[in-house]
């Protein structure tokens, strides 16, 4: 049987090589079939097999692993795109990752159950001949038979219901989805999320969902889970409450560094001003405006993202919250060149990710950490101002974080760090001037309100 040149090339590791193909379903007619009869997210006569080689240098004997795509989630961008596949691969220590699941043409149910996990042992036995054939030749050196483990994907989802797919001119395809989160030992929590196809493993925004008052009154016994199963029309975002995402809580906590200055400003009747570089679904600017009484300017690169924020995440503009479409980094530089006194901010909060999906998830973009851009950000801050950055160091570049810390030390007076604790995010807070008060000072109305949004992250701020 003739083998295509692409498959023939799999005999060796080629950095970043990605290919996918259809293969006769080895589970068909067997009790080990994790996909049932092919309906509602199951696999039919063929399965989709996708192979990705790591962009990182391979060891002398590269290792291969495989993963079964969860039933019903085969069209989820985490499993169906190269960007999602790359994120999964980089979270392991393998040089090649094989994904096997239903073909993308197979339908998915409107509400996808996510809790069930197939028994990997019988499925592994059925897949093993294919997996061995997909190992590089060097893995068979000295007549060895390589081990190809079957990895398991875990997240905290119980249900997933796509609400709307839209495409923006800058970020490309995106999806709004309602999900049920496992909050054991408590009840499941419903949230609305926004994800981009170019970085499917990164949740751009998520907010809690609650039932519309009319729906809750009409069926007081119905649960939020039942509302999700029934119709998203019965649900609405819970706007103005505590922030869901820990890294956003940590970003807000960074304001504690200048709490005395903000307290003094509020007491004098002057609202502190904040520039939010990156709006997403609007959780951060809405919380700062509503919960902390800031005057907020948000800048988002893609107007479609702002439309999604207004229509699906409860973003409401008013005299104290304005959003603009544009390049946030360019706007920072433009403001700095004008040097207008009324354009000074108490805080500049940067929540921007890299636009290069092949770098996996990383933040902020490289343009943001140039010394000239950081100097421009310092210029538009007042004397007691802070620059707060959400940082996700790229997995393949261990020097990124140290380099960012070094350049911030060169431009700003002091630097503080919060480790979000999720293995990905760090929040860096850089001050224009040396701080004269201790972070241990817990007094003041502003800090009381800040704790409602930031949780216990105020206790994790450390100077570096």
What annotation goes with each model-predicted range?
Residues 182, 200-202, 302, 433-436:
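Short loop/turn segments at secondary-structure transitions that flank enzyme active sites
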Residues 193-234, 409, 440-455:
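Aromatic/acidic cage segments in peptide-binding pockets
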Residues 2-29, 42-47, 51-165, 169-171, ...:
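The AdoMet/dcAdoMet-binding core of the Class I SAM-like
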Residues 177-186, 418-420:
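Short beta-strand micro-motifs enriched in acidic
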Residues 78-79, 185-186, 202-206, 438:
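Short, solvent-exposed loop/turn elements at domain surfaces
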